[in-house]
């Protein structure tokens, strides 16, 4: 009987940990800011992390063929059981995007999948399903959670001020 109970506990812990994968936003390690300056653009971004919340501030400009800022994290998922990304966000009443980059061959090399979402100045919860992502370029890998290379939150494609906060990022 004791062996049966131990097996059941191990089964529950394993099952729950596989289905509750979290990107652990409380630990800022591995998250990084990226701007179009890597390709000659002039957008600027500062990122702060406090009490489990990331704060993105800056500006996106299309000057000099630029136009993006991103908060990005490389991840390594071993199973294909996740259906999307959930998070809480607020900001300056602008549109931001979730970007997902896949492993493997891409044309052009910076191709990604994305979904836009609008923020208000109040915290809102967002759930973005992988099936709702739109392709921005060609990727040889199919959209499966075990093919994800990184996940980013981006200000993209137009001139605007970035004032954005995000927390509780997780895969579901």
Language-model features, listed with the residues they occupy:
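Beta-rich carbohydrate-recognition modules and glycan-binding surfaces
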Residues: 18-172
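Sec-dependent signal peptide recognition
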Residues: 1-13
């Amino acid at each position: 009987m004791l062996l049966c109970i131990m097996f059941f506990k191990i089964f529950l812990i394993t099952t729950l940990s596989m289905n509750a994968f979290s990107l652990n936003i409380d630990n800022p390690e591995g998250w990084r800011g990226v701007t179009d300056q890597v390709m000659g653009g002039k957008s600027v971004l500062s990122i702060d992390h406090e009490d489990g919340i990331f704060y993105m501030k800056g500006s996106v400009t299309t000057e000099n063929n630029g136009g993006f800022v991103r908060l990005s994290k490389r991840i390594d998922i071993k199973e294909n059981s996740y259906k999307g990304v959930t998070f809480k966000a607020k900001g300056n009443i602008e549109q931001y995007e979730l970007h997902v980059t896949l492993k493997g061959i891409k044309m052009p090399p910076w191709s990604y999948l994305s979904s836009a979402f609008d923020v208000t100045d109040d915290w809102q919860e967002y759930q973005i399903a992988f099936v709702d992502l739109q392709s921005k370029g060609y990727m040889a890998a199919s959209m499966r959670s075990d093919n994800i290379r990184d996940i980013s939150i981006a200000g993209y494609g137009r001139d605007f001020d970035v004032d954005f906060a995000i927390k509780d990022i997780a895969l579901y």
